[in-house]
Structures are given as structure tokens and as C-alpha cells.
Amino acid sequence: MEIRNAIVDAMFCIIYKKKALTWKTGIERRTECNLPTSNMAAQRRNLMQSHQSWTDDLPLCQLCGVGTAPNCMYGTDGKDTQSHPNEDTHLRFRSEDGCSLYGVFNGYDGSRVASFASQCLTAELLLEQLSADHSDTDVRRILTQAFEAVEKSYLHTIDDALAEKANLSGYMLPHSEKVQERLKELEQEVSGGATAIVALILNNKLYVANVGTNRALLCKTTTDGQNQFFQLGRPHNTDNDDELKRLAALGLDSARVRQAGQIAGQSSTRRLGDYRVKINYNDIDLLSAGKTRPIIAEPEIHGSQSLDSVTGFLLLMSEGLIDALECAHGPEHVNKEIVAMVAAELAQQTTLEAAAQSVVDRVKRLHHDVYTSGRQRATFCSRHEDMTLLVRTLNYPLADGVLTPTQAGGRIYPVSVPYSNSQSTSKTSVTLSLVMPSQSTLTNGTNTASTLEEGTPTPGGWSRCRRRRNFWTRQPCI
């Protein structure tokens, strides 16, 4: 337990020593790094504010590509302006022992928590904590403990700032200009949170850990020749019945929570950081009746799922990407559209990075085109948040001129993808030549493409779209 509590300290030692090959006890680590115990929290805070990361020296997975786009809001002329610094981050590492770790972190009120979580979680999972002889139960336990350590470590980094904030709030001259300025600085230092979707591949088995409202999709070609896609888990939000039951068991009024749609400005019922709903949850009306902390950082873990003989790809998506496509086309077919776009780009691009980025760029264009179309849905597309898409291929070839999906025995399939034309008044479709790596059809779960995601339900349908974005539009999505 002492070693687990000091894991983050080791991570910061790695920063200053550049390379750390073995774990030592907490005292040894502090001695080696010449960092006194009392100074550890300050060092953590300094690192969180810098661009330096010990993970910069880790090997990236070459079977993975990432596409990103910053948040933006559109002006009346259709031009976009970034409204705040990027808050998303991601990780994609592959250790020498064959363990691969991927993640997409969606930050809010700053990128501090997302950046901290991505670094700390990597230290918790890729420095020899996992081995090939671990059982599924062991891996799930280690994943859960890793998120717990990240949460505790982050909250520890803001202890001093929270104490100073509490002290100044009770100051005899609280309205002093200097006091108010310092309180504002402290609030900026401690505020913020993040949601996370993390995938781990060990022994060619897939494990997915989710905290919040990001999404994971697995697309694979089955033995009967069908390409199926599955949503791995459901979002932890105010439309998730299981989450509402969990909150009700803690004493909360689940009906009020569902009706509110958001808790402290976010729809997620699980999140990392965000001291307001963790340390000060009793001060929030919706949460004040809770017997314990209602908003938690415990991940929901899916797996293991064997990847032996699997051909396809894994997608990790930030909430911003999902929201942008939902606002443009509605939530019913988002998974199908994303899978079709990724498959089409993999058949055309020569690098995974280019394929992932092309999909994100396309979603951004679709969102923008709906806004400039002047149609009814334009009202709900006036802005979008940061977007991140991580694509990890599973024996899936690229169009690299050497081995393309068609050369590998695949066929070309027409796939209808909704497309918004600024000159029209309704959503139309265009047909893509979708190249799949085998003779198959695109399906969802065990259903064909015509079933339109019956196997991956979207909780709450349009109501979820409305509640998640009511702080933008104050109107229902239709």
C-alpha cells in the first residue's frame, strides 16, 4: 500500500531523472530525486502547469492514429473562433512486454485534470504492474486501483490551495480587492475535471475502462463474413438508469437528477477531479442528501474480450466528437456513421494518423455545414467542444499501395452516409465506396446495417442531446 500511495511521487521523480527503470520505496525515491516529502505536492502542481511530461520518452503504438480538432464557436458570418484552450488529451503507448494502453480524456474548466490523469494513469499501468500471468480478475482490479490512485493523487495536489482558499474565504475583509484576486487565482488552480475512456490490450485481450461520457466502439469482421460494431458500455450521465439507481441508493432524488440533466454544469455522473462535487458535494443542492460522495471516479470495466484472429478496429472518442455529430444529424445513427467514415478513410489514407484526422475534419465540416445551412438544426450547431478520435487497427490493412483491403480479398460496398447540403432544406445521403477487408456487410452487433444501431442503444435519445447542451442553446434539440 505504501508503494501504491507513492506511485505518483515516482512519476515526478522520473521527470527530473528522465529515466526510471525500477520502482523503489517512497523514501528511496524522494532521496534519489532530491525532493523533500513536504515539497512533493508543489512539484506536482508545477508539473501540471508545464508542458513537460515523463511520458514523452515512452514508445508510441504504431498501430494507432489520433485525430483532433479544437473547440470553436461560429460567428454570424460562419467563421469559427476558438472559445478556450484545448482541454482534451490522449495516450497511446506500447510497452516492451507487449502491453498496450490507449486513452482519451475530455477535460473541462481547463486541461489540468485531463493532463494529470493521462500521465498518472500511464505510470500506474505501464511500469511493470501488469504481467502476462495476470488473470482477468487481476487486470480489472489493477485498472480500478489505478483510477483510484489517480483520483486520490490529484485531489492531494490541490490540498494546499483548497486550505488557503478556505482560510481566505473566512478572512475578516473578504471583500478586499487583493483577497478577491487571490481567491480567483486559487479557484482557477483547483477547478476542473475530466472524463476518461481507456483501453488496455494485454495477452491479446481487450479491456475498456470508462469514467464519464466518452465512448468506445469495437468493429470486427466475424467468422460468417459480417463486419459488426459494438458500443462497449454506456455513458455515465443523468439518463443512465443504472447510474440513477446508484444515486438513489445514496439518498439522492433520482427524478430530480434526471430532470436537471446536469450536475454542477456537467451531465456526467462519474468524473475525475472536480473538487466541487467530491469535497464540497454537500453544498450542491442536488447532491446534498448523499450519504457519501455521489459523483465518483470508479471506472466501469468491460472485458476481457479476446482479439485472437480479429480483423477490424477499435475507436475511442471524446464527448465533443460525439456531440458534434449528434447535433448535426441526431443521436440515432452516430455509431454507424463514425464506423463508416473510419472504414472509408482507412481504405483511402496511407497512414493511421491521416485516417483519424480526416474523420475528425469531416465531422467538423458536417457540423459547420449544418450551421451555415440556415435550417432548423442550425440553432443547435452554433459551437462545438474539443474533438478527439483514436483509431487502433486490429489486423486491418491500410491503402498503402502494398497491401490494401481489396488486395487482401475484400470487396467494395456502397454505404449511405447522411450529408448536409447548405442548399437543401433536409438531410440527404451520399453513397461512399466502403472497402472492407473481407466479403462482408457492415452490421451493428448481430443485426444488419438496416437495423440502425438496435444493438447499441443511446440512452434517452433526443432528451440526452437536449440536456447535455441546454447550457448552449436553452432549447430542445429536435
Label the model's feature ranges.
Residues 1-478:
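PP2C/PPM-type serine/threonine phosphatase catalytic domain
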